């Protein structure tokens, strides 16, 4: 073992499904509703009175000073559903589940309830993760790759800088090595600016529910560099 952290951590579709169900969408149907308990919130969702991602207030069992107590929390219906699987001994988990947070959550469960119940918990989140990824219908769509409107300006500015560097070299103001380094610097700067623009647009698209962005942000698959190559520019070769 490298650091003692659990290695039985869900991946890919499972992570994506759990991330999706715990994400909050501002203005979703049923936002602001108050429920007496978890069961009430789940019934309201099943009866289509509120959305899976709506922010609601629910009275839940949570750890307060090491003791389980009932208290009202601002959460989402999706998080209530996830907490049906999480052992009550670790309290109410009120956050977005990503691959990173899952590792800590699993470690807490193992510490609190032991291996046997932790295995049941892992089976439960595995099944829920797969089911929610299926229900969400998340896939890689061409329309999910958002090309930033600033792309033409950013690339154009970079090309102008490179042209100036080449002109300086041809006039003998800089050496060949300096020319090479300055061209690399110019395109690296363009690439970084484009990546920032791509991620800004992806984060804001569909209130953060862009399928490709969710795959990236959850840790299920992909990286910012890969998305930037698809929506921005291929980059330096």
Regions found by a protein language model. Give the residues of each.
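Gly/Pro-rich turn-and-neighbor structural signature
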Residues: 177-231
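Feature marking long nucleic-acid-engaging regions of large polymerase/nuclease enzymes
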Residues: 1-176, 226-236
